[in-house]
């Protein structure tokens, strides 16, 4: 991984709640921790590969890292986690603001709008569009990782 990317994610990777996300499965056999890191890295690579200008890399990566910072096992429907796909962006933002109260408007928008079109309101910023695209790409990766595991 590039130094620029590592320098931005290091503060978040040290957070104890973020570390605990490695214990909860997101999709397939991939933890929420690994999924979030993958989304952030794919978003970073997307910007670099396409040589996009006027992208706030710092906000892009931080928003991507925190987009699924909801801190619960969404598979446990009986614990009140119904409609997870619609609701978790709000829980993720609420939790992220407790630890990172300095989140800017782009980072907040990335977290809140990454589930578009499921959550109806589209992203507002280029950075949020990139993250929501890379989140879908990472989810397919997570899903097919599960399929590979089953075939073995």
PLM feature segments, named:
Residues 1-152:
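Metal-dependent phosphohydrolase cores
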């Amino acid at each position: 991984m590039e130094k620029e990317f590592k320098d931005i994610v290091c503060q978040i990777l040290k957070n104890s709640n973020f570390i605990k996300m490695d214990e909860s499965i997101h999709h397939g056999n991939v933890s929420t921790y690994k999924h979030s890191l993958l989304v952030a890295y794919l978003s970073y690579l997307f910007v670099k590969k396409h040589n996009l200008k006027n992208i706030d890399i710092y906000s892009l990566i931080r928003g991507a890292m925190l987009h699924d910072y909801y801190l619960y096992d969404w598979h446990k429907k009986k614990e009140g986690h119904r409609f997870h796909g619609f609701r978790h962006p709000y829980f993720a933002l609420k939790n992220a603001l407790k630890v990172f109260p300095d989140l800017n408007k782009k980072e907040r928008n990335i977290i809140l709008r990454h589930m578009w079109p499921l959550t109806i309101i589209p992203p507002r910023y280029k950075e949020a569009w990139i993250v929501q695209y890379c989140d879908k790409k990472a989810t397919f990766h997570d899903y097919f990782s599960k399929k590979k595991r089953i075939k073995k």
